[in-house]
Amino acid sequence: MSSTPSSPLHLAVALDGTGWHPGSWREPVARPRDLFAARYWADLVAEAERGLLDFVTFEDGLGLQSSHFLEPDGRTDQVRGRLDAVLLAARIAPLTRHIGLVPTTVVTHTEPFHISKAIATLDYVSTGRAGLRAQITARPNEAAHFGRRTIPRIDAYESLAAQEVVAGLFDEAADYVEVVRRLWDSWEDDAEIRDAATGRFIDRDKLHYIDFEGRHFSVKGPSITPRPPQGQPVVSALAHWTVPYRLVARQADIGYVTPRDADHARAIVAEIRAEQEAAGRADQPLHVFGDLVVFLDDDPAAATARRERLDALAGSPYTSDARIFTGTPAQLADLLEEWRSAGLSGFRLRPAVLGHDLPAITRGLVPELQRRGAFRRAYEADTLRGLLGLARPANRYAAA
């Protein structure tokens, strides 16, 4: 799905702890004592919904957060510990009406049958606003939590051995998402009859074995949960290079990418579109969102000073896999429009300090984009697929 100046711009925020900067929990607006309370997360999502954002993502993992991508660290001066993202989204769903809820689900070591059921349940309790963000893990210590296999230690993603390991995990992730999608379709939409007079609750002919046999999974099905309200909840994944671009092209509705500038964004979009065509999905809608970490203030100097203060608290300059934007909402709007012209259809923003930068997005950036005619002034659909302009897909097992 390509972006044009007349197509709607989509916005999401990524929720993680007190914010994406490791020093964020020490800011006066942070609420570190509330991190494991449902109300804290409900307040964040309510703020995002007031800003008419398309959806929020909830970060998750199978190990404690770490300053090192590939192994635990011993730090005690940063936020550690999480709530389960899927359960958290389900708790918040009844408190919201329009915004999409997209928990991160680690597809390495977990089972697609369980995740398909969990996300289908979230789609029901949110009345059609669920999605998932599929994520792999290459950390050996996280494999040890399950004891089913080992993953060799990787010292750097750049090595050939590391790339082979990671490529295998992404190949497994593609099979995983395929199983999840087939399980969502294993009940036809009208499989439930619920006729008390005749005593027929379901039509057994409309439940289907999926009989998936792949390199990584063998799953018979059907699911135990009826087909979700959206048919297929929205699937997304973060991608930084060709192998995860291929996962996005094969299986996702949204890919989150991390360009350095507009030219890089244009090249990434072109590569994903080529992979999409190679996968036989050129006719399928696929959003490509840019990921950015944001420090937003009304004065650029204030944003820079705040970032420097947080760096001092953390003990080192903040770095990220995504571009770090420091400036005003108007300057960010300029950047988003520039990158949009490169083919991105939306953006997932990572607030550096949730208590500060999330309201700066909803009360500063959103009104600026609205003034430019680039963002909605009201929610126009009741489902996440509807907000994203994605049609409800037909069931692959239903009789033609």
Language-model features: where?
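Active-site mouth loops of central-metabolism enzymes
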Residues: 23-39, 104-113, 136, 149-167, ...
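N-terminal beta1-alpha1-beta2 module of alpha/beta enzyme domains
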Residues: 2-96, 230-233, 382, 398-400
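Internal, glycine-rich beta/alpha segment that forms the wall or movable "lid"
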Residues: 7, 111-246, 250-251, 284, ...
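Conserved, mostly hydrophobic/aromatic
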Residues: 11, 48, 52, 92, ...
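Hydrophobic faces of well-ordered beta-strands that scaffold small-molecule active sites
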Residues: 9-15, 56-58, 99-105, 128-134, ...
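C-terminal helical cap(s) of enzyme catalytic domains, especially alpha/beta-barrels
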Residues: 146-154, 176-181, 265-275, 354-375
